[in-house]
């Protein structure tokens, strides 16, 4: 009695909860785990390290087995005084009774002559069977027997606590018998029309109500045949009667209509696309079953449903079973790839019935999907049960939900448990009590539990929603955290110079197919962390080079370790490229290294915000490189070379971190040397920024400082000068042990663009097209040699004159043809970066010409050198 009282309390509380009623109908929600209640140290199933990926089985309406007591008492007390209250039904009883008696209230609309008196109770004796054929008598007797059985069931169930459910079961049984009787005459049109007219005119009102209930049930299953049957009566009753009868027979009544209307399923998170794999080749002769259509409409409440149909040529004539399965699998797989190409960020869920569930599982092994739902999974095959060593389904990595019936013939629950233990993927199992392969519960289960099929289907749908919500939430959180982590990584200041570069790492690919969304850039700006991919619009994707912007380089790296990591991680694309730079053979002292480290930390600013609006003014990068005289010629240095081997540590300085701030990057490499000659190089190169829409073209400007005549402003560069106005710079005094700088021209490096070798100085504006379709402009520029002289204080005046207010604008004004290059009509864009490289080298001048990420150096002839009238620059105090 205590158990019944607890069951009654649960039902009462469940009815109060309203919308969450159906989800709490399952047995696993009713039964409390006494171990978890009594023992606080109890752990969940997944706490064990050897726990498999199979989650505990969830039971829906599975009656727990209770062991019978062996001891039988001799005297059993019988309580005859206590009144047992009737348990409240799981649905709205008042509304269920209202729809149950609908046909009885409107039975008058079915009669052809509404004004005629109703037939008496002994109507069967007044039926005139004169002139009936044997087929007519036989058909009439079958229908009458089915209606009499339904009448007896109604009288027996009258007043029961769950009368609507019992009435629904009796009506379904009567409808099945009527359908069998009509099928015995092959649905002969004349015969079934005669039968319907006779029954409507002769049946009593209670029997006619039962007949209308049967027609209402059959109208939802076989509407065409029922409409053919009602043609003769519609002509007699008129338009009004026909319309009323049509509305009455529109859909069968359901006791749980109130509960289902209040418990609407919610949409799944992430707006997934639900693909329904077909269970066989589609055909116009055999359309999809009514139950499959019903489930398709139910799943449409969760998300966008896309049924995948398989069409065979010539209605499948000459096509074997294996070929048909290959066509079905290929159709689903092609649909998955098509959706991935159009909606790469949309999660895809595969759902299938029976054979379609197997197809969905096989497709999930080959292509990336978010989850798989198998309804009525067929575990038994013609070759035996699944789960052998060579079963490809054991390699599944996609989360999968199996929904099977307790009385299923193709899948036993115990065998399904063994199969789930072998699957590597996260999987769950839902067992529907008393259900068959199509998840339809039996009539005995409906009577004992007080359920209808619609309530069971809604509970199954709730289980599917619960499983998919967890999977989609975890997947959405995992994908959504990546761009947030990358943005935070860009904003914060890195503390370790030698930290690993995550942007160049290749993600490990497991046996599960990778998501297409992971292949797309997750940063809002479309660029990777620490790098931006730059290429020409006409260049192929294989020749794209990866460059590091000056702002990111100044804030995150101070040595050539980035280039080393870059080459190691992208050697598959860039192994054919090399870089040649002059190297000093003498080591750098530890004191100088320490000073450079201090200056490096002092001038490190925070890196700019990735989401800030880019400035329209060009950025200026100044590099000052001084090399020793021990360099006899160009030496080959891999990009993975250590900074110590390059003859010193570079110093990177940037002024301004906001979008509109002016930036200055000075790169200094010091080394012990006794040379008296060097080189001065100025080059202008725009930086390349890649965006989500279309990448900007690469336009490189290289200028030569030819120390022959005093610098003067040229009238053709007014627009370029206006671009650089207002830029103010300052450079901290740099302690150096280098010697004087002669005015020898040399093409400077453009670290953010593509350059080519220039054998001779060009005296006019020229264009050279490289292998990657990049335009290179070479502009000769005149300047004075006296500007490179040293001041009495020992500070290089050339740098100060170049970097003071207006000095860089004068330099831009001295670039001929810059206005023509920046002209929008010519198809080229305004330069975004001007790179100035001041290099001091021995008599043999070496040119660094980057080519994408790697570069090939070219040696300038001695004829390009100016008269040796260099002046020494003493070291700064």
Swiss-Prot record:
Transmembrane segments: none annotated. Coiled coil: none annotated. It holds the Pfam family Abhydrolase_11. Residues 478-511 have a biased composition (Basic and acidic residues). GO terms for biological process: chromatin organization; positive regulation of transcription by RNA polymerase II; regulation of mitochondrial transcription. The modification Phosphoserine is found at residues 523, 536, 540, 746. Residues 551-561, 860-877 have a biased composition (Polar residues). Its main location: nucleus. It comes from the Eukaryota. PANTHER family: KAT8 REGULATORY NSL COMPLEX SUBUNIT 3 (PTHR13136:SF16), TESTIS DEVELOPMENT PROTEIN PRTD (PTHR13136). Non-catalytic component of the NSL histone acetyltransferase complex, a multiprotein complex that mediates histone H4 acetylation at 'Lys-5'- and 'Lys-8' (H4K5ac and H4K8ac) at transcription start sites and promotes transcription initiation. The NSL complex also acts as a regulator of gene expression in mitochondria. Within the NSL complex, KANSL3 is required to promote KAT8 association with mitochondrial DNA. Required for transcription of intraciliary transport genes in both ciliated and non-ciliated cells. This is KAT8 regulatory NSL complex subunit 3. It comes from Rattus norvegicus (Rat). The lineage of its organism: Eukaryota, Metazoa, Chordata, Craniata, Vertebrata.
